[in-house]
Every structure is written in structure tokens, then in C-alpha cells.
Amino acid sequence: MARTVSLWRREAVFLTAMLATETGVVGISTLFKVATSKGLNLYAFLGYSYLLASLLLLPSLFFTDRSRSLPPLSLSILSKIGLLGLLGSMYVITGYIGIEYSSPTLASAISNITPALTFILAIIFRMEKVSFKERSSVAKVMGTILSLIGALVVVLYHGPRVFVASSPPYINFRQLSPPLSSSNSDWLIGGALLTIRDIFVSVSFILQAKIMSTYPAAFTVSFLYIVSVSIVTSMIGLVVEKNNPSVWIIRFDITLITIVTMAIITSVYYVIHSWTVRHKGPLYLAIFKPLSILIAVVMSAVFLNDSLYLGCLIGGLLITLGFYAVMWGKANEEKDQLLLVSGKERTPLLLNG
């Protein structure tokens, strides 16, 4: 009984941590959409926020991972973390450009394909097993297909508005910024970029799991990763904006608030992800993505005066059904493995008796 209670508490910690990170990610996406209308440059935003995040995380290295027995930080591990940083840079750049073209709601809807993509990659890299004789495997495969179909619906079918938001009395958003709406062509471009982002995200989940299996130091890995992203995004920004140095000047308004908020969320986000992927695997990280669309719809309606379109609703529903199918299959698979281990533990006791 005590073991069961302890297990449930442990699961509750993972669940709460992941829900908090997803809420933070959607929140910063919404804030970024507002800040860009006030002149915040993407590369300045990423470079400064990741640099500040690394500085916030630096003190933790002196009293966390140093107290543990860890393998040496070899060139191989550093190379993998550097590659992870490159992947991270690509997915944050494509992701935020995609949000500029579309909306945080679309970004959250399309991110629901991450479990499906991660599952496919996990099979390729032998982190997940598939047997069509087992219901759990069939559920995971069908859920993957359903999620991909849903993502295509969200991107390719805009549809009529099913919910038209209006600014609440206490936020007159039209005075803060121009209307943040997207044309059909922008919606398609944004959807394509966000899909590319989620491919990078899924690959990074797999690589992160590989790194944490050989070097299980969440704070150190997160710090080095964040530093890598800061360097890569800043270098790209210096090249892209070489004729426009004024973009690196940050004003004391919502742009600064966005950068500081992003830094705080980033420093916590990647530590939680590294810690979770070590104990639960890459698919566990990915299955929380569908929940972000519910958060995004509320935040976009309240803060961005965005409307909800039929294509996003239908696609989001299909993706969510696919998500729960994958999650059900994963849960049943873990349950079967636990029963198998328990049976093996009891067998020697019966023989000794």
C-alpha cells in the first residue's frame, strides 16, 4: 500500500511539472505575439532570453550535479549536447516565425503531432516496440495516424469562424497593438513552419533521451544546451540583421518583460524536461503537447482577441483523440511490464517456500 501511494505521488509530481511547463510555453508564445507588434525582433528575443536563462541557471550547477557521481563530460557528450543546441535553435526559430505568420492557437494545435512523430522515431531508434498482436501497440499506431490526419486538417483547412472573441473591458487591446490576424496564405506558411518545428522537437526529444541515459545531469545538460542555443541564435541574428543593428536595442516596455519572462520559463522548462525524459522517456514528454491547445485557445481569446476557426477545432479534436489513443496504449504497455516484473519477483519466493 505504501509503495502504491509513493508511486502515485511520484506520478503526480511529473504530471504537475509537465502541465506547468506547457502552460508556460503557451503563455510565452502569446506574450511574444504581442511583443512583436511592438517591435521586438525574433533574434534579439531569442539571443537575449537564452543568455539570461543560462545566467539564471549557472548558480545551480554549484550545488546540484556536483554532489553526484557522474561520468566524465567527454567530447562525445559535449558534441551531442551541441547538436541538441543546434536542433533547439532551429525549432525555436521556425516555431516563433510560424507564430508570427499565424497564431499561438495554431502553434498549439500543430504541436499535437509531436507524440506521433516522437513515437515513430522511438520505434526507429528501438526505444518503443510494436506488436500488432497486442492492443496497446494497435492503439499507439492508430493514434499516431489519427494525429497526423488531424494536423493536416488544421494546416490545410482554415474554415469559417466558430468563435469570435472580443476584447474584455479591462484590456483594450486595439490601443496596445494593431489587429493580430492572419490571411489564408499566412496561415499556410505558418502551419508549414510549425510542422517543421515539431519535427525538430521530436528529434530533439530522442537525442535528449540518449544524452540523459549516458550523462544523467539535468542541470548541467540544460545549462550547456541553453548556452548553445543562445550562441547559435545570436550568430544567425547577426548575419540576418547585419544591416539593421537597431533591432538589438531593447526598450523598457513589454519587449523587456517578454525577454525576462522567456528567460525564467526557459531555465525551468529545460531542467524539468531533462529530468522527466531521464525517468519517463521521450514519449512521455510528447504526450502533453495536445493539452496546450486548450490553454492556447483561452489565452489567445483573452489577450490577442483571436477567433477560433472550424479547421482548428476539427483538427484539434482528431489530434486529441489520437493523443489519448497513444497514451492509453502506452499506459497499458507499462502496466503489462509492471505485472511481468512483479511476477518474476514473486517466483523465487514461491520456490524458496
Swiss-Prot record:
GO terms for molecular function: transmembrane transporter activity. The chain crosses the membrane at residues 12-32, 43-63, 81-101, 105-125, 137-157, 187-207, 219-239, 252-272, 283-303, 308-328. It is a multi-pass membrane protein. It is found in: Membrane. It holds the Pfam family EamA. Signal peptide: none annotated. It comes from the Eukaryota. Keywords: Membrane, Transmembrane, Transmembrane helix. InterPro entries: EamA_dom, WAT1-related. Residues 27-155 form the EamA domain. GO terms for cellular component: membrane. Belongs to the drug/metabolite transporter (DMT) superfamily. Plant drug/metabolite exporter (P-DME) (TC 2.A.7.4) family. This is WAT1-related protein At3g28100.
